[in-house]
Swiss-Prot record:
DNA-binding region: 145-210
Annotated Polar residues bias: 56-66
GO molecular function: hormone binding; nuclear estrogen receptor activity; sequence-specific DNA binding; steroid binding; zinc ion binding
PROSITE patterns assigned to the protein according to its UniProt record, in alphabetical order: NR_LBD, NUCLEAR_REC_DBD_1, NUCLEAR_REC_DBD_2
Occurrences of domain NR LBD (ranges): 273-509
The protein, known as: Estrogen receptor
GO cellular component annotations of the record: nucleus
Region Disordered, annotated ranges: 45-66, 96-122, 216-268, 516-581
């Protein structure tokens, strides 16, 4: 009835069953771990214990024998024209390469935005290929928190997140928590350090796409809520119909033009609630960049301007991607999009620089690895004055305790308000759809006022704060004009390489400000690509930002024409900015 076992030699046990006899050998050694890190200091674990190292399923991008490979997650959060496909993974000859295929909403801050040259390497042994195929089903079910990379408990507020980050975001949006980063707003948020800085953790939540109303579309309560909203909207339509019948003719015409003639994107922009506008603006914020320039201190005039222009060219690419995420911007014509960007690009970059430097008195944070103080600006003629104005405005931001919601509104207002008075300059064409731009501007201004009204202050204090915030824009415009003139003077002295996108923006600004129409420039007037100063360290790190943005020849130096000092000699079309848009 019961199986009888007999001990054999060599540690082999024989068990007799009714169907036959089975031999069980001694336990075999544990299989070789699938992944082994070649870089010291990383935790190594077998696949069957923790699953694959990626967030989702892995896709094979190559075929060949089992051999070591290099695994680098892709970076879909960045603009596609910023990084060519060869930057997403490193591949050797006849080596199978696997990369992550997780959507951008489930990934944390991209590796391309982190300063460092070390790559995460994983090697696959001979027995790993079979185990990898068997582990695909496990990988499909495993999710990680988009904020801290811990194991996700579910889909919360629009992204996969853990219980800790879900509860933290819920507390943050329900209460009035004025978090302040004790460092430079660059704290690392992971499983072990997510509680060290609440301000950076909340910023990370917004960066990965957490939203107040974000939830899965297949939830039943969403359908019930939609039904309730449908009933409410029907009642609102009925009440609006009565108001429309009794309204004066002028108001009636205004209502018809705003509802029927605005288009789908514009009408949805007008009806968007202020809280949703604020969430969209915060989610559109670009990541913090790295200069990756290996220039020794103290800086000279050439090295300083090389650093700044290289960073400006990189930020311009991200600024265009940021503008395209603004609600209603893509519904504008291409002419209006380019017009707004060309008129406000330096103001947008400057307010971003001031916001990054708000918690570091006396410092200007151009990038994670490029932090300058006032004394370092003395190496460039006229730069110390601009540094002083930037530091003074950052001090004013700090004194007003500017909040992230207010910052994103001011930044969008700068972009949209730049085309309000285009008719004042004879060489600048007016916007094709000025009414749509004004509607966008009104919507963002209403969102700013709505946020200020939620502060709990008196009506007088709320009105005073609105005025204080909007008055900052005139100072930023003044700094932008100073910076534009300084950059133009450096360009005329041939002391700094200017990349194609940056030079295109500078030329457009000079053309719009000219007293007479710009002359037609011929192809022969263009200068050859700048190479000598670039080889000395000028464009090593910045070339990646401009090359994939439509620039094919790298930085250029152009000269002022001796016969026409008011006209630049670099091709005056809008090819660079229009190509990106």
């Amino acid at each position: 009835m019961y199986p009888e076992d007999s001990r054999g030699s060599g540690g082999v046990a024989t068990v007799d069953f009714l169907e036959g006899t089975y031999d069980y050998a001694a336990p075999t050694p544990a299989p070789t771990p699938l992944y082994s890190h070649s870089t010291p200091g990383y935790y190594s674990a077998p696949l069957d214990a923790h699953g694959p190292p990626s967030d989702g399923s892995l896709q094979s991008l190559g075929s060949g024998p089992n051999s070591p490979l290099v695994f680098v997650p892709s970076s879909p959060r960045l603009s596609p024209f910023m990084h060519p496909p060869t930057h997403h993974y490193l591949e050797t000859t006849s080596t199978p390469v696997y990369r992550s295929s997780v959507p951008s909403s489930q990934q944390s801050v991209s590796r391309e935005d982190q300063c460092g040259t070390s790559d995460d390497s994983y090697s696959v042994g001979e027995s790993g290929a079979g185990a990898l195929a068997a582990g695909f089903e496990i990988a499909k079910e495993m999710r990680f928190c988009a904020v801290c990379s811990d194991y996700a408990s579910g889909y919360h507020y629009g992204v996969w997140s853990c219980e800790g980050c879900k509860a933290f975001f819920k507390r943050s949006i329900q209460g009035h928590n004025d978090y302040m980063c004790p460092a430079t707003n660059q704290c690392t948020i992971d499983r072990n350090r997510r509680k060290s800085c609440q301000a950076c953790r909340l910023r990370k939540c917004y960066e990965v796409g957490m939203m107040k109303g974000g939830m899965r579309k297949d939830r039943g309560r969403v359908l019930r809520r939609d039904k309730q909203r449908t009933g409410t909207s029907d009642r609102d339509k009925a009440s609006k119909g009565l108001e429309h019948r009794t309204a004066p003719p002028q108001d009636r015409r205004k209502h018809i033009s705003s509802s029927a003639g605005g288009g789908g994107g514009k009408s949805s922009m007008i009806s968007m609630p202020p809280d949703q506008v604020l969430l969209l603006l915060q989610g559109a914020e670009p990541p913090m960049l790295c200069s990756r320039q290996k220039l020794n201190r103290p800086y000279t005039e050439v090295t300083m301007m090389t650093l700044l222009t290289s960073m400006a060219d990189k930020e311009l690419v991200h600024m265009i991607a940021w503008a395209k995420k603004l609600p209603g911007f893509l519904q504008l014509s291409l002419h209006d999009q380019v017009q707004l960007l060309e008129s406000s690009w330096l103001e947008v970059l400057m307010i971003g620089l001031i916001w990054r430097s708000i918690h570091c008195p006396g410092k200007l944070i151009f990038a994670q690895d490029l932090i300058l103080d006032r004394s370092e600006g003395d190496c460039v003629e006229g730069m110390a004055e601009i540094f002083d104005m930037l530091l003074a405005t950052a001090s004013r931001f700090r004194m007003l305790k500017l909040k992230p919601e207010e910052f994103v509104c001011l930044k969008a207002i700068i972009l949209l308000n730049s085309g309000a008075f285009s008719f004042c300059t004879g060489t600048m064409e007016p916007l094709h759809d000025g009414a749509a731009v004004q509607n966008m501007l009104d919507t963002i201004t209403d969102a700013l006022i709505h946020h200020i009204n939620q502060s709990g202050c008196s009506a007088q204090q709320q009105s005073r704060r609105q005025a204080q915030l909007l008055l900052l824009l005139s100072h930023i415009r003044h700094m932008s004009n100073k910076g534009m003139e300084h950059l133009y003077s450096m360009k005329c002295k041939n002391k700094v390489p200017l990349y194609d996108l940056l030079l295109e923006m500078l030329d457009a600004h000079r053309i719009h400000r000219a007293d007479r129409p710009a002359e037609t420039w011929s192809q022969a007037d263009r200068e050859p690509p700048f190479t000598s100063r670039n080889s000395s360290g000028g464009g090593g790190g910045g070339g990646g930002g401009s090359s994939s943005a439509g620039s094919t020849s790298g930085p250029r130096v152009s000269h002022e024409s001796p016969t026409s000092p008011g006209v630049l000699q670099y091709g005056g079309s809008r090819s660079e900015c229009t190509h990106i848009l």
